[in-house]
C-alpha cells in the first residue's frame, strides 16, 4: 500500500522547528560543557596517556554532536546529513549486508552508477559498463549514503589486474588499522582477518611496517618512526594523499613538524611514487620493490577529492604475465588517476571486500602482515 504523506499545518511546522531548535541548543550546550571540562579539568592522572584520552573523548563528543544535528535536521530543513567516524575507534560501523551486490555483466550496471552519482555527487567514474572483465569473474559493489565501492578484474598484457574504486562522503571513512590495534604489536594477521575485525567495506594490505625499518610511520597524527630512505604517502584530514620523496624527512622532529603543519592523520611507507599531479614520475632505481622484474604489484591511487582507486596486479593460470613497475605505472596512468603510490606487492598485495579476497594471490596464500588501510561506512551499524 502506498503511503500518503499529509502536508503539515503552519502550526505543526512551527512546533517542529521549535522542537529542533531546542534539541540543537541542548546538544550543543552539553557538548560545549563536556569539551570545556576536558580541556580545563582534564582526565585523572595528568599523564600523556590521559591527555590523549581527553583528545579522543573530545573527538567522540564532536562526532556525536555532528551526527545528532544531522538527525535532528532530517525532514525539517533541506540540509545534507554529515556522518563521520572517530579516528580513535578501532572498529567501524558494520555495513548493511543488503547493500552489497554482484554481477557478471557490467552492461547491466548503469543504474548502479546513476544511484552512486546521485547519492554521493560523483561526476567521474573509473569503472564503466563497457569494461571487459576477466573471464569467469564478477563485479562486486557496496552502496549507501556515505560510501560507494566497486571491485572488478581485467586482463591486460596477459596479466590480471584487480581494481577497487571507492568514493566516500567524509575523510574519516578512510582508515588505517595496525595488528593488535597498537603500534609495534608482536603478532601479525592476514588482510582478510583484519578487514573483518574492523568492519571494512573494502580493505587493502598496507605497507607491512614491521618487516623493515624504512619510512615514516604515522598513526593518529603521531610519528612513530622516521627513516627517509623511501617515499612516503601521507593522508591528511581532507582525505588527500600527500606524497613526499625519499630523503626529505629524516628524523622524528622533522616528520612531526610536517605532520602537524599538514594535519596528517596517518601514513603509508613503501613506494615509490608512480604518479603525482597526473604525471608519471616513477624512479629508475629504488631501495625496495624489484622495479625491473615481472612481479605482483599493488598501489593506492587518488582520482579526485574523496575518490580513490586500489590496484593489484597478479599472474594466474593462463594470465601469468606480471608487470614491471614501469608497466604498472603506465596502466594506472591510462586509468586517469591523479596520484598513485606503490604498496607492498608480492604475497602481501591483497584487496578485500565484504571479508572476501578479491584478487588471486601469488604463491598460493595471503601473507600475515602488520597493518591494513580500509574504507568504512559512516552510517550506524547495519545502515
Where does each model-flagged region fall?
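Extracytoplasmic
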Residues: 159-163, 197-198, 269, 295-297, ...
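A short, polar/proline- and glycine-enriched secondary-structure boundary/capping micro-motif
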Residues: 185-188, 251-258, 293, 319-326
